[in-house]
Structure formats: C-alpha cells, structure tokens
C-alpha cells in the first residue's frame, strides 16, 4: 500500500530538485557574468 505513494513522491521530487538545481546554477551564472563585466 505504501510503495505506490513512495514512488509517486520520488517521481514528484526528482523534477523539482532538478529544476531547483538548474535555477540556482543559472542564477549563479548570471551573477558571475555580471561581475565579470
């Protein structure tokens, strides 16, 4: 009974974590680009 819920939570968390990492990396890149100029 718990396995489908757990798999759903994992499948829901993976894209969110990937999106968060991508956004933070993008913001750091933007900040570094502004500092370099």
Swiss-Prot record:
Which Cys residues form disulphide pairs?
none
Which compartments does it reside in?
Plastid, Chloroplast thylakoid membrane
GO CC, one annotated term: chloroplast thylakoid membrane
Gene Ontology terms, MF aspect: electron transporter, transferring electrons within cytochrome b6/f complex of photosystem II activity
Concerning Pfam families, the annotation shows: PetG
InterPro entries named in the record: Cyt_6/f_cplx_su5, Cyt_6/f_cplx_su5_sf
TM segments? Answer: 5-25
Q: Which GO terms describe its biological process?
A: cytochrome complex assembly; photosynthesis
Q: Which UniProt keywords apply?
A: Chloroplast, Electron transport, Membrane, Photosynthesis, Plastid, Thylakoid, Transmembrane, Transmembrane helix, Transport
Its membrane topology, per UniProt?
Single-pass membrane protein
Q: Which family does it belong to?
A: Belongs to the PetG family.
Its function? Component of the cytochrome b6-f complex, which mediates electron transfer between photosystem II (PSII) and photosystem I (PSI), cyclic electron flow around PSI, and state transitions. PetG is required for either the stability or assembly of the cytochrome b6-f complex.
- NCBIfam families according to UniProt: PRK00665.1
Q: How does it assemble?
A: The 4 large subunits of the cytochrome b6-f complex are cytochrome b6, subunit IV (17 kDa polypeptide, PetD), cytochrome f and the Rieske protein, while the 4 small subunits are PetG, PetL, PetM and PetN. The complex functions as a dimer.
Query: Which HAMAP family does the protein's record reference?
Result: Cytb6_f_PetG
This protein's name: Cytochrome b6-f complex subunit 5
Give the organism the record lists. Chlorokybus atmophyticus (Soil alga)
- Gene for this protein? petG
């Amino acid at each position: 009974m718990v396995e489908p819920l757990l798999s759903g939570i994992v499948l829901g968390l993976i894209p969110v974590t990937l999106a968060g990492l991508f956004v933070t990396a993008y913001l750091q890149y933007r900040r570094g680009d502004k500092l370099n100029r």
